[in-house]
Amino acid sequence: QPKNGEITAQQIKEALREDTILVSTMYANNETGYMLPVKEIADVVKHHPAAYHVDAVQVIGKLPVYPDELGIDFMSASAHKFHGPKGIGFLYFNHVKFDKFLHGGDQEDKRRAGTENLAAIAGMVAALKESLNCYQENMEYVESLKQQLLSELDGIHYYINND
């Protein structure tokens, strides 16, 4: 069982079955802040026929994420989490083949029928670029807030996820 909500690559390995076709994890838990060991999990899953999906909603625009370096097959994110338009997101996928899930048109390289919301897509791209351009400045600010909080907790026992 996960301790403090922390899932390890070994636990994923032990949970894989012969009929497992997809492993899907969060990159970071939105309530606890725990960041899963995505690269290590991907290293486990690559030795199995299953595909690996990562829900990166909580980290996109806050941390640099390179799906190819992580070794994941699918990654999803939502623009509103990095100050983009609501109602738009994206699905990254590498070489994995999958059947279309909405039939009727040839949009999205014949993977999904329907007209793309180009204005929302452009807004999402602009917001993501801006988030990544401000990454270092934002991380320094968040780190200063963390240090301020920790100084106030002096003498109090506490636990920090991922430390």
Question: Which residues make up each language-model segment?
Answer:
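Pyridoxal 5′-phosphate
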Residues: 1-163
